[in-house]
Amino acid sequence: MVRLFGTDGVRGVANIDLTAEQALSLASAAVEVLAGPNRTSGPSGRGKPVVVVGRDTRPSGEFLEAAVVAGLAASGADVARIGVAPTPAVAHAVAASGAMFGVMLSASHNPMPDNGIKLFAAGGLKLPDEVEDAIERRMALPPSRRPVGADVGRVRDEPVLLDRYAAHLLATLPVPLDGLRVVVDCAQGAASTLAPRVLRAAGADVVALHADGDGIAINDGSGATHLDSLRAAVVAHGADVGIAHDGDADRCLAVDATGEVVDGDQILAMCALALAERGELVDDTVVVTVMSNLGFHHAMREAGITVVTTPVGDRYVLETMRAGGYVLGGEQSGHVVFLDHATTGDGLLTALRILGRVAETGQPLGELTKAMTRLPQVLVNVRGVDRTQVDTNEELLRAVALAKAELGDEGRVLLRSSGTEPLVRVMVEAGTDAAARAVAQRLAAVVRTALPPAR
């Protein structure tokens, strides 16, 4: 049986892969598992459990929100609905309000027809795999009880939780952003209103791009996965920095004043060095995934900073950070976790840390990113093959071993199946772009021929 939860919650085409019925069932099962049998008592032992619910701007978010709220309230949970909000705002609201758990409706960077459900446990942390599995099993069973009368949940709108999140973000800034001109691309998503508001409150001169909150156009040629319009806008407006969020604003990429892209690895390198300089980088350690550029590893080694590597997914980065007590980690894609200020990847917080560093040093972003040199990296996505055999197919394993031997210490090869899409990713790094591209294309061809078609 295919697991319902992927690496970042439940995701698929809304109304086909993810229906209102499934959303209601999942919400009800989550209350059963996370609140337990005594659902008239919340975490403090007083009153019903409270669940925070937020969504991005996708049209399908409206009916999915209605279904989730119905499932929660019918199962005896009170609902604090915060409306359109970044994913990390839901996590913060759960932690700050003492809610039992939180639900975010978003498919992040995926196209508009998709949607998804992410759950946050008490304290604002993403759920462990075993808890997600328990919820999935519970979905197959009838409800253990149906509250009636005063025991059913009540629903209220709580926009004040977003205001508190914004205030929390602003409190993390080391210095005001006065004098900085910033272009922020909100991808027509969850940060469309909040990101420009927070940056202006911090003192920046803000140009807002793709910030109408038009969910029909979410991630369409905009945001963290489509940086061309941001690059052009930064140059056209003479901005100091460009900031790009994805649909749910849990990640952030940047653009320097010349229009050059600054990826998650460069952001992490810059922030790691800043924290180490202040003596705030716990154990001089940063946590990244296997996708981080080899150039990042080289830069950290030269700075005396230890790098701990995890599987792909900010949830695994976070688990490793919590286990080791580390304060900084993230992904090349722009999910960055500052564990001393957040419980999950936070695009708005990351933007403020980038801009704060520019403001306090007086150095251009392009100068700060020279902390590391990226090795050429080529990523090829192979669709239509059985991704479950990536780690077991002998022909493919031999091809990977040969490629690694060819590149030696000056390059890297990584093959993995996507946790959110039906594809296999082939990633190669090498001393030159041509070498990386040649090896990647060769391995992609082996993937297509060695692996059977997807079922």
Swiss-Prot record:
<feature type="active site" description="Phosphoserine intermediate">
    <location>
        <position position="108"/>
    </location>
</feature>
<dbReference type="GO" id="GO:0005975">
    <property type="term" value="P:carbohydrate metabolic process"/>
</dbReference>
<comment type="similarity">
    <text>Belongs to the phosphohexose mutase family.</text>
</comment>
<dbReference type="GO" id="GO:0004615">
    <property type="term" value="F:phosphomannomutase activity"/>
</dbReference>
<dbReference type="InterPro" id="IPR050060">
    <property type="entry name" value="Phosphoglucosamine_mutase"/>
</dbReference>
<keyword id="KW-0460">Magnesium</keyword>
<dbReference type="GO" id="GO:0009252">
    <property type="term" value="P:peptidoglycan biosynthetic process"/>
</dbReference>
<dbReference type="InterPro" id="IPR006352">
    <property type="entry name" value="GlmM_bact"/>
</dbReference>
<keyword id="KW-0597">Phosphoprotein</keyword>
<dbReference type="Pfam" id="PF02878">
    <property type="entry name" value="PGM_PMM_I"/>
</dbReference>
<dbReference type="GO" id="GO:0000287">
    <property type="term" value="F:magnesium ion binding"/>
</dbReference>
<feature type="binding site">
    <location>
        <position position="246"/>
    </location>
    <ligand>
        <name>Mg(2+)</name>
    </ligand>
</feature>
<dbReference type="InterPro" id="IPR036900">
    <property type="entry name" value="A-D-PHexomutase_C_sf"/>
</dbReference>
<feature type="binding site">
    <location>
        <position position="250"/>
    </location>
    <ligand>
        <name>Mg(2+)</name>
    </ligand>
</feature>
<feature type="binding site" description="via phosphate group">
    <location>
        <position position="108"/>
    </location>
    <ligand>
        <name>Mg(2+)</name>
    </ligand>
</feature>
<keyword id="KW-0413">Isomerase</keyword>
<dbReference type="Pfam" id="PF00408">
    <property type="entry name" value="PGM_PMM_IV"/>
</dbReference>
<dbReference type="InterPro" id="IPR005843">
    <property type="entry name" value="A-D-PHexomutase_C"/>
</dbReference>
<dbReference type="GO" id="GO:0005829">
    <property type="term" value="C:cytosol"/>
</dbReference>
<dbReference type="GO" id="GO:0006048">
    <property type="term" value="P:UDP-N-acetylglucosamine biosynthetic process"/>
</dbReference>
<dbReference type="Pfam" id="PF02879">
    <property type="entry name" value="PGM_PMM_II"/>
</dbReference>
<dbReference type="InterPro" id="IPR016055">
    <property type="entry name" value="A-D-PHexomutase_a/b/a-I/II/III"/>
</dbReference>
<feature type="binding site">
    <location>
        <position position="248"/>
    </location>
    <ligand>
        <name>Mg(2+)</name>
    </ligand>
</feature>
<dbReference type="InterPro" id="IPR005841">
    <property type="entry name" value="Alpha-D-phosphohexomutase_SF"/>
</dbReference>
<dbReference type="InterPro" id="IPR005845">
    <property type="entry name" value="A-D-PHexomutase_a/b/a-II"/>
</dbReference>
<feature type="modified residue" description="Phosphoserine">
    <location>
        <position position="108"/>
    </location>
</feature>
<dbReference type="Pfam" id="PF02880">
    <property type="entry name" value="PGM_PMM_III"/>
</dbReference>
<dbReference type="InterPro" id="IPR016066">
    <property type="entry name" value="A-D-PHexomutase_CS"/>
</dbReference>
<comment type="function">
    <text>Catalyzes the conversion of glucosamine-6-phosphate to glucosamine-1-phosphate.</text>
</comment>
<protein>
    <recommendedName>
        <fullName>Phosphoglucosamine mutase</fullName>
        <ecNumber>5.4.2.10</ecNumber>
    </recommendedName>
</protein>
<dbReference type="GO" id="GO:0008966">
    <property type="term" value="F:phosphoglucosamine mutase activity"/>
</dbReference>
<dbReference type="InterPro" id="IPR005844">
    <property type="entry name" value="A-D-PHexomutase_a/b/a-I"/>
</dbReference>
<keyword id="KW-0479">Metal-binding</keyword>
<dbReference type="InterPro" id="IPR005846">
    <property type="entry name" value="A-D-PHexomutase_a/b/a-III"/>
</dbReference>
